[in-house]
A protein has these predicted regions:
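Flexible, solvent-exposed loop/hinge segments and secondary-structure transition points
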Residues: 2-208
């Protein structure tokens, strides 16, 4: 009996030791990868802003954060990157907007000119189904079936199935609705952005 108790104690100690060592290794690996992952996200955002504003040489002149409630009363946060060209002329803004897609959160970056017209968009993060909802990165671009470029969402953009004029992604109506909601919300946040001249966020140059 004592031998059995001793064996169990040793087993517990060994398993505990292994768990501690593995936990330390995972923590170390996470520490090593945090920096590169953060740098990758920063670069993706910088490239995304250039893409959606359709300008390769620009700077973010001001960063604003807008909080608005959705239809269910949930508070949503939007980040607005006010942009200028190399000569200091205002171009409009790129807006980060997140909604729930079919497979998880759908984070969209939408570029607007000063009047609120859509210049471009890109997906920063998504968990949509490859070959279906994931097509959102191309489907709504200029010249594509669901083209929204050049539109102003003062009247919310909706899919044709809901009485709107935007063709939904084939077999991916949920993703299409989520995407358009993200764009509509981004527009509303853009229009609600403070117009003060004072900078409220970091200013940085973005060159090709």
């Amino acid at each position: 009996m004592k031998k059995l108790e001793s064996s169990l104690t040793n087993m517990v100690l060994v398993l505990t030791g292994v768990a501690v060592v593995m936990g330390g290794i995972l923590a170390y690996v996470n520490h090593l990868t945090e920096g590169p992952i953060a740098e990758q996200k920063t670069k993706a955002l910088a490239d995304g802003i250039k893409t959606v504003m359709c300008v390769s040489d620009l700077k973010v002149s001001r960063t604003d954060t807008v909080h608005q409630n959705d239809a269910k009363g949930k508070e949503l946060t939007y980040i607005i990157y006010q942009t200028q060209d190399a000569q200091g002329q205002d171009l409009g803004a790129a807006v980060e907007s997140v909604t729930g897609g079919f497979g998880g959160d759908l984070k969209v970056l939408v570029g607007f000119d000063a009047e609120g017209k859509i210049l471009g968009y890109t997906l920063l993060e998504h968990a949509e189904t490859p070959g279906l909802g994931a097509k959102a990165d191309k489907w709504f671009q200029k010249g594509e079936k669901g083209d929204i470029i050049g539109k102003t969402p003062s009247d919310p953009l909706t899919v044709s199935k809901d009485g709107g004029q935007v063709d939904a992604i084939t077999a991916s109506t949920i993703t299409s609705r989520a995407f358009l909601l993200a764009v509509n919300n981004a527009y509303n946040a853009f229009k609600a952005t403070p117009t003060a001249d004072a900078e409220t966020g970091a200013t940085k140059q973005m060159k090709k």
